[in-house]
């Protein structure tokens, strides 16, 4: 039994989809994280264990501590979690480089990220550059993609430097406006595109009067694009069991109330006609109480009538049974009525 369960469990594991592999950080991301933690460590230890008293002594002692190996060791100990194998591996491989920067290169290369990740490890590029040789992004390193997009591979040794434009912009330098946007300002290096009015497919300005072409669901009336009321069309766009609601640029078909046969709007007050079992009362479809009508709804003798939404139910009372034209009292119930407290005889048992 246990072997069967184990085999079944193993088969289930094989059939289950594999867990999604977590995306590993790139070498540049690992290097940047290490540098960020190093800089944070420097900030945390900047005035450690000094807090008032003999100022001259503090300045002298602090100056020694600032560049000491003790401080470096404290910073290095906080760079990687014990469970982060890749971080610890990188630190072990580059420990001597970090010590060299700390002891003799920090003054000439104050930007640790640039010296360590860009120049030494060649894992990253400076902002605005990309790829193995850290080439400038499209539009230049100062304002890649004219400031209106992202440079593929920006700051890394990856990517192709092409521009991925923000919403509203297009073109190799993200300087042109997409359909639905207009140019507010443009020169050789800068471009500002703003959204057209919702009624415009293309436009030259912000209002519905600036439309060059109307969007679908809108039509030009005089000098502006206005909403088309599809619900007012000669042939309604919705089915007979629905009503039409106009919205800007389109329409919505909503279901009629369950009591309606056709409707002009929401709820039982907007029914064109009522379904069977309902009738118009005070302007809306209401349930007919068939059991209270002058003409009896339940035709069989002794039968009880119960009203339900849109209909009624005919049921024989307790102690009665159905026949074709009446509810007939059962023999057992007749005996009980004649002798309500008399116990059953031995023969009856």
UniProtKB/Swiss-Prot annotation:
Keyword Repeat among UniProt keywords: yes
Record-annotated EGF-like domain positions: 133-175, 287-328
PROSITE patterns: ASX_HYDROXYL, EGF_1, EGF_2, EGF_3, EGF_CA
Signal peptide (from-to): 1-22
Residue ranges of the motif CXXC: 28-31, 260-263
Keyword ATP-binding assigned: no
InterPro entries per record: EGF-like_Ca-bd_dom, EGF-like_dom, EGF-type_Asp/Asn_hydroxyl_site, EGF_Ca-bd_CS, Furin_repeat, Growth_fac_rcpt_cys_sf, LE_dom, Nephronectin_domain
Gene name in the database record: Creld2
Family to which the UniProt record says this protein belongs: Belongs to the CRELD family.
A Pfam family this chain is assigned to: EGF_CA
FU repeat coordinates: 190-237, 250-297
Expression (tissue specificity): Broadly expressed in brain (at protein level).
Record note on quaternary structure: Interacts with Chrna4. Component of a complex containing at least Creld2, Manf, Matn3 and Pdia4.
Sugar-bearing residue positions: 187, 248
EC number: 5.3.4.1
Gene Ontology molecular functions: calcium ion binding; protein disulfide isomerase activity
Functional note: Protein disulfide isomerase. Might play a role in the unfolded protein response. May regulate transport of alpha4-beta2 neuronal acetylcholine receptor.
UniProt cross-references to PANTHER family, sorted A to Z: PA14 DOMAIN-CONTAINING PROTEIN, UROMODULIN-LIKE
Major place of residence: endoplasmic reticulum
Name used for this protein in its record: Protein disulfide isomerase Creld2
Catalytic activity: Catalyzes the rearrangement of -S-S- bonds in proteins
Localisation: Endoplasmic reticulum
Covalent S-S links between cysteines: 28-31, 137-151, 145-163, 165-174, 260-263, 291-305, 298-314, 316-327
């Amino acid at each position: 039994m246990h072997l069967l369960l184990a085999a079944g469990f193993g088969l289930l594991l094989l059939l289950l989809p594999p867990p999604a592999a977590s995306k590993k950080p790139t070498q540049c991301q690992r290097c940047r994280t290490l540098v960020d933690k190093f800089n944070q460590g420097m900030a945390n230890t900047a005035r450690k264990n000094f807090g008032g008293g003999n100022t001259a002594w503090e300045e002298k002692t602090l100056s020694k501590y600032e560049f000491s190996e003790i401080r470096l060791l404290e910073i290095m100990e906080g760079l990687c979690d014990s469970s982060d194998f890749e971080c610890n591996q990188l630190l072990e491989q580059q420990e001597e480089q970090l010590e060299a920067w700390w002891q003799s290169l920090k003054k000439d290369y104050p930007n640790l990220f640039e010296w360590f990740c860009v120049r030494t490890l060649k894992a990253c590029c400076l902002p605005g550059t990309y790829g193995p040789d850290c080439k400038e992004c499209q539009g230049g390193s100062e304002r890649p993609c004219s400031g209106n997009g992202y440079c593929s591979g920006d700051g890394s040794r990856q990517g192709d430097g092409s521009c991925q434009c923000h919403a509203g912009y297009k073109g190799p330098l993200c300087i042109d406006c997409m359909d639905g946007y207009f140019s507010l300002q443009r020169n050789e290096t800068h471009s500002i595109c703003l959204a057209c009015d919702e009624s415009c497919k293309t436009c030259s300005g912000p209002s519905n009067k600036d439309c060059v072409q109307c969007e679908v669901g809108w039509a030009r009336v005089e000098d502006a694009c206005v909403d088309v009321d599809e619900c007012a069309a000669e042939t309604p766009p919705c089915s007979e069991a629905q009503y039409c609601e106009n919205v800007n640029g389109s329409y919505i078909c909503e279901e009629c109330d369950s009591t309606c046969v056709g409707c002009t709007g929401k709820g039982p007050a907007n029914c064109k006609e009522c379904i069977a079992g309902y009738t118009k009362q005070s302007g809306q479809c209401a349930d007919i109480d068939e059991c209270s009508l002058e003409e009896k709804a339940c035709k069989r003798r002794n039968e009880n009538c119960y009203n339900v939404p849109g209909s009624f139910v005919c049921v024989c009372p307790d102690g009665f049974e159905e026949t074709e034209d009446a509810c007939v009292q059962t023999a057992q119930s007749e005996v009980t009525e004649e002798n309500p407290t008399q116990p059953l005889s031995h023969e009856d048992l």
